[in-house]
């Protein structure tokens, strides 16, 4: 399917076959200064049926996996660490987002048929999931940096501080996502079905730039720099001091951070490229807009996939998580105590900070 841009009276634009963009902004009208010469813009996206199958699998895995993670952490009161509290909140964010996946999937297949209120709510949950995820991981990186590099008992060891920090992260995530919540609505573009989109009137381009740059700066780039700084020095300390026991205890945390970056970094890099194109920092052409639009579609699916991956990390890398899950199953008679004994009791590794070991 294509969109034909024509030089009509008053530079109006005829949009034919405008498809549901699903919140990633590709295929929107070009900026006001664009040269409106005839231009054929492809809106062909990934196979809808394949996307529906992937979303359905992600939904089921995320629903089951994150529920089990929350169960294991909440059940393991003894030995629960500050990091576990952060990971518990991370699982909550992924679970909340997973609950919206069926709605997003249906909108890909049939357009947005759920009205403006639900459009605002699911868009808010999607943004809050991303921002809370990277902010929680940034807090974990700072806690590990202080505990290992400086060998200090951090303020976050005081449980009331941990609660306030987590509440602050959720509040900041909502604030960063608030513009999307305010301006998203069920919108009817010309020659298209309803979409869940932000319609900002004549100043759409300018406001969309602001809505992108500020959250990307404070909700992605700055936390990413904090994580790179903290984990860079943490890794250097672990390897230079040959602290193998702490290195093993950090494997799960490093894996969680790595998977988050692999899933969400591509989408945000493409989004930055799209923003630069709309700001005329890089030239806007039909081909470039097509390429960025397809890249946004593909990388967004990768970002959605992240919501079901953390539980898999805990299962394959986190020995304590596996043992905690088997222990719960044994208590409820789902497996024998002999089978639990064969799994063995993982040793909890201590540290100078007192909280390097985690339930996972």
Curated annotation (Swiss-Prot):
Extracellular face residues: 1-48, 106-120, 184-208, 274-294
Disulfide-bond pairs as recorded: 119-196
Per UniProt, subcellular location reads as: Cell membrane
Q: Which residues lie on this side of the membrane: Cytoplasmic?
A: 76-84, 143-163, 232-251, 316-360
- Which Pfam families does its entry note? 7tm_1
Q: How does it sit in the membrane?
A: Multi-pass membrane protein
Q: How does it assemble?
A: Interacts with IL8. Interacts with GNAI2.
Protein name (record): C-X-C chemokine receptor type 2
Gene (UniProt):
CXCR2
């Amino acid at each position: 399917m294509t969109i034909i841009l024509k030089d009509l009276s008053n530079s109006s634009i005829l949009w034919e076959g405008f498809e549901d963009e699903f919140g990633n902004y590709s295929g929107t009208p070009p900026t006001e200064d664009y040269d409106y010469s005839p231009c054929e813009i492809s809106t062909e996206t990934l196979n809808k049926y394949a996307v529906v199958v992937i979303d359905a699998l992600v939904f089921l895995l995320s629903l089951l996996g994150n529920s089990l993670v929350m169960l294991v952490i909440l059940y393991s009161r003894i030995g629960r660490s500050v990091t576990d509290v952060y990971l518990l909140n991370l699982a909550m964010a992924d679970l909340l987002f997973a609950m919206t996946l069926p709605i997003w999937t249906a909108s890909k297949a049939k357009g947005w048929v759920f009205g403006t209120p639900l459009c605002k709510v699911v868009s808010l949950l999607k943004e809050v999931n991303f921002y809370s995820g990277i902010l929680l991981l940034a807090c974990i990186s700072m806690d590990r940096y202080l505990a290992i590099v400086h060998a200090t008992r951090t303020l976050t060891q005081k449980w009331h501080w941990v609660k306030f920090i987590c509440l602050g992260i959720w509040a900041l995530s909502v604030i960063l996502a608030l513009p999307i919540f305010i301006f998203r609505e069920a919108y009817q573009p010309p020659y298209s079905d309803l979409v869940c989109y932000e319609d900002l009137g004549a100043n759409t381009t300018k406001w969309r730039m602001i809505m992108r740059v500020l959250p990307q700066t404070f909700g992605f780039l700055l936390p990413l720099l904090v994580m790179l700084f903290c984990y860079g020095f943490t890794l250097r300390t672990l390897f230079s001091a040959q602290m193998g026991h702490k290195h093993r205890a950090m494997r799960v945390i490093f894996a969680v951070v790595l998977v988050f970056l692999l899933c969400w970094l591509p989408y945000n890099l493409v989004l930055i490229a799209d923003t630069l194109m709309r700001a005329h920092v890089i030239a806007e052409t039909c081909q470039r807009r097509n390429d960025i639009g397809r890249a946004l579609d593909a990388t967004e699916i990768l970002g959605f996939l992240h919501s079901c991956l953390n539980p898999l990390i805990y299962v394959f890398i986190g020995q304590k998580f596996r043992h905690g899950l088997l222990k719960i199953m044994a208590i409820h008679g789902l497996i024998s105590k002999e089978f639990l004994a064969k799994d063995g009791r993982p040793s909890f590794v201590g540290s100078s900070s007192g909280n390097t070991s985690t339930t996972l």
